[in-house]
Amino acid sequence: MQVNGDLGNIKTYLLKELEDLYTLSVPIGQLSTHELNERMLAITDILDREVAVYMNRQGKIVQVSLGDADTVDLPEVQRQARSEHSLSGIRCVHTHPSGDVRL
């Protein structure tokens, strides 16, 4: 699976860490897991950049994105066709390098 964002000058081992986030899953009914949070925070601490993961309703990570120190892009995520009035079923968990909780 592909990591989105500006990946220039990212060391190979960190790119692998980002790609490995796709192997994790989150149990239904949970927003995230300790392991996922720890891995995302470790990458954020090293790069001083936001990391975002997008999960479907089953807890499968469907997208990983790397942002800059202030923002991370929300790419278009492919999903099954649904009514135009239904929710996407995709949730986002992301980090803030500065610790600022405001979006």
Predicted ranges, named:
Residues 62-77:
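Structured interaction and signal-relay segments at domain junctions
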Residues 59-60, 98:
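Short, charged/polar surface micro-motifs in flexible loops or helix N-caps
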Residues 50-57:
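Short beta-strand scaffold segments in enzyme catalytic cores
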Residues 25-28, 53:
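Short, structured surface patches at the beginning of a domain
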Residues 1-23, 76-103:
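Active-site-proximal loop/helix of nucleotide/amide-processing enzymes and allied scaffolds
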Residues 44-48:
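A short catalytic or substrate-binding loop motif that flags glycine-/basic-rich loops and adjacent residues
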Residues 27-42:
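Short, basic/aromatic recognition patches
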